[in-house]
């Protein structure tokens, strides 16, 4: 039950952004976006992280794409998502590990151009030592479930 509450809270945090005006919706026409056109918003479910929704909304069962901008020295505890996650590193270095326990010694450094693909439900964690931007592709609705609900950064 705690996992469901966490997922609902995260969807609500993403949903407020996904339903806002911006690039997040289009009518099936060709879409081209430059980095200068992205609108960055605070991400309540990950305090300190910014999100730019490119395609969405994140609350519906549609293709989604968004960028996450992590500050330096940030970490996200072990968690999973209900859909497949494709993440491409745009800038900086995202250190990613797999499993239920956060362990910096068991991560791989993903530098610009690197890609990670995780099946639904894969437990993983990340950390940064510098500002890092990653672009996520998936199918909504998007949510995050923490392995340990007490680790949810939005609750701290």
Enumerate the predicted regions with their spans.
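His-enriched metal-coordination microenvironments in redox/metal-binding proteins
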Residues: 46, 58-63, 77-88
């Amino acid at each position: 039950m705690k996992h469901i509450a966490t997922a609902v809270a995260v969807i609500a945090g993403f949903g407020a952004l996904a339903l806002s005006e911006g690039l997040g919706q289009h009518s099936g026409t060709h879409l081209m976006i430059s980095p200068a056109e992205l609108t960055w918003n605070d991400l309540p479910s990950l305090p300190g992280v910014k999100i730019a929704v490119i395609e969405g909304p994140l609350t519906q069962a549609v293709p989604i794409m968004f960028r996450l901008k992590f500050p330096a020295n940030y970490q996200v505890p072990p968690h999973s998502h209900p859909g497949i996650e494709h993440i491409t590193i745009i800038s900086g270095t995202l250190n990613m590990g797999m499993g239920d326990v956060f362990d910096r010694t068991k991560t791989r450094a993903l530098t610009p151009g690197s890609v990670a693909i995780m099946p639904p439900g894969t437990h993983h964690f990340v950390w940064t030592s510098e500002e890092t931007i990653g672009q996520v592709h998936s199918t909504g609705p998007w949510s995050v479930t923490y392995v340990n609900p007490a680790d949810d950064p939005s609750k701290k």
